[in-house]
A protein has these predicted regions:
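Bacterial N-terminal signal peptides
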Residues: 1-7
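Sec/Tat signal peptide C-region and signal peptidase I cleavage site
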Residues: 8-12
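A short beta-strand-turn-helix
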Residues: 22-42
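Short active-site neighborhood of thiol/selenol oxidoreductases, capturing the structured segment around
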Residues: 37-61
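Solvent-exposed loop/turn segments at secondary-structure junctions
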Residues: 51-53, 91-95, 125-126, 151, ...
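Structural microenvironment flanking redox-active thiols in thiol-disulfide oxidoreductases
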Residues: 53-111
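Thioredoxin-like thiol-disulfide oxidoreductase module
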Residues: 94-138
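Thiol-/selenol-based redox modules, centered on thioredoxin-like
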Residues: 127-130, 137-172
């Protein structure tokens, strides 16, 4: 039983900590400083630092867009969420040189409605790997920040309804 508990990945160590300072850029090269520039609202961040984890990060795009970004119409107008959402592919080490190419590819291939919600990080991985408890390279990590930048919830991996329900519960 004890061994089983050790094998279960836990994001609990980061909950309650401030999200570490990160400077990233939009596809149009606008600098966004996290958590500084998102203070005042709840924020959902998705980070990926390998090609494989980027694919799982992408599995969140549509559900997150539908739930938190797309403006509700008709009877439900006014019942949407007022949250910041950013998906952040991280280009570190030798991959940092690919940032420009990735931006161009995103502009060409990503739904234009989603582009403002993608930030590109280029720089060191170690400070984030340590502060955010990244255990596995091939999965994305998600964090819900409170309006001051403190981590309220953390999860990882491909999209699932149960993960989305937990994200939603924290934001409500």
């Amino acid at each position: 039983m004890f061994i089983l508990l050790l094998a279960v990945p836990s994001r609990a160590q980061v909950v309650g900590k401030m999200f570490p300072a990160m400077e990233a850029q939009t596809a149009e090269d606008k600098v966004v400083k996290l958590p500084q520039d998102v203070q005042g609202k709840y924020t959902l961040l998705g980070l990926a630092y390998s090609k494989k984890s980027e694919d799982e990060l992408n599995s969140w795009f549509e559900p997150v867009f539908s739930k938190f970004i797309q403006k509700t119409q008709g009877l439900m107008a006014g019942f949407g969420y007022d949250v910041n959402v950013y998906f952040i592919p991280m280009f570190t080490g030798i991959n940092a040189a690919a940032t420009g190419t990735a931006k161009k590819k995103a502009i060409k291939n990503v739904d234009p409605q989603l582009l403002p919600y993608i930030l590109f990080y280029k720089g060191e991985l170690k400070p984030y790997k340590e502060a955010l408890d990244f255990e596995k390279r091939d999965i994305p990590y998600f964090f819900v920040l409170d309006p001051k930048g403190k981590i309220l919830f953390a999860t990882s991996g491909a999209y699932s309804e149960s993960k989305m329900d937990k994200v939603e519960a924290v934001i409500e």
